[in-house]
Amino acid sequence: MKIGTVAGTNDSTTTIATNDMVQEHVTNFTKELFGYIANGIGDDISSIARTMLGEVVEKIDDWQIERFQQSIQDDKISFTIQTDHSEKYSMLSGMRAHILRRNNNYQFIVTINSKNYGCSLDNTDINWCSIVYLLNNMTVNDNANDVAVTESYKPIWNWKISQYNVSDIKFETMIKPQFADRIYFSNCLPVDPTSTRPTYFGDTDGSVGAVLFALFATGHLGIMAEGENFLSQLLNIEDEVLNVLLRENFNEQLNTNVNTIISILNRRDIILESLQPYLVINKDAVTPCTFLGDQTGDRFSNICGDQFIIDLLKRIMSINENVHVLAGNHETNCNGNYMQNFTRMKPLDEDTYSGIKDYPVCFYDPKYKIMANHHGITFDDQRKRYIIGPITVSIDEMTNALDPVELAAIINKKHHAIINGKKFKTSRAISCRSFNRYFSVSTDYRPKLEALLACSQMLGINQVVAHNGNGGRERIGETGTVLGLNARDSKHAGRMFSMHNCQINPGAGPEITTPWKSYQHEKNRNGLMPLIRRRTMLQL
């Protein structure tokens, strides 16, 4: 039963000041770069372009740096600069800036009206490492000193809470048969709900049934007999969605396909209303359960389904510290209307932002030395920094560069600083819009297996990841291994979706077969950070 309205609410916001010294550093840095360019323009360059650059140098405070990290690769850093909506500077709104590296020589280039103006950075006092650090970590919003602070999450549903013996849940005899012979659960491994060995679940893609399966299997959730028929109806409806997604001619750009899925998901809303009163949370469940991200905001998602998942998981986390929910690229960037992003260009009133904004990116288990995260963490040896999606952590920022606890804390802090930005909530409402660079970078980051293994071995940990995984095995081996879990099943042709899970068996030792086979996503064969493309959502 719901305890409040679901749609049409607006969070009230307040503002807090950011670090003025950091802002001053960024402003001076940008001003100096433009100064070098302005001084280097020759007489053969048009006076209009020269005047433009001169005005930028003199009036830098009228500029807003929309997003520093648009693309970071081995040889190029690109970012856009946008005017403060002032008529005087409107001619500059199309300016693009790049820092290029050629044979260890760095050049700053500005493109205006299809012409490039540049200068070398090698004879300046600007340190390349500081350039990378600033461009990679800073975002200045509409008001550079304002950060949005939204209200805390308000529960939507009343959830029954009880004390169960695991045997009372009757997973094997009553619940598991509901999921049997369904494609989406064909790769799920058995879980021992009486064990304290941790379990991990990969992408669930907005499937309510997948989240329920994870909670049933680990003993965190039970269901009354009256709810079994509604559970069956829920799974049948989500099978319908899967069948549409698996059609050879399915195209997310076609309104007919999108509207078909939206119509099916609207029927699911009614079933969820009927099912919810018969679900019972087991407050004494002992099996740790970690969701690795992309639980919501994906192809099985609509607002009601995502709110159902978020509300249930938050309630369980509030009473059982064994459950952890991590942020992936989808719940972070998509507001629950994933499919409707393709049929509209204005945000809807409904949003899941308040429910996901406090999700961490990483969770480190010191007992088993496991770093759970969605993307996988790598280490850039040349620049001495850790990379996870759009977030980097320089070793200079750490007290102990090999401490996984400290690393996870810094990563989570940086992630929350970004998604609490004043502009971010708006950008996630329509993720395919070009200003949502966080979505682009976090989606396209698909590191190679070797890079993940090297980072794990350096830190002396294991990593359990999702996103680019192609399915894991039940056991994880010695320190330094990686287990990849994902809802995308690379072993089958077409767009086969299935959920993957694992339960750690720490005494097993390394397997003969690598837990994560050497599967490399086609988008990332040429480098660590692929070029960011427009309409990234169509390429997931």
From Swiss-Prot:
Pfam families: DUF4049. It comes from the Bacteria. InterPro entries: DUF4049 (IPR025123), Metallo-depent_PP-like (IPR029052). SUPFAM superfamilies: Metallo-dependent phosphatases. GO terms for biological process: inositol catabolic process. This is Uncharacterized protein YhiJ. It comes from Escherichia coli (strain K12).
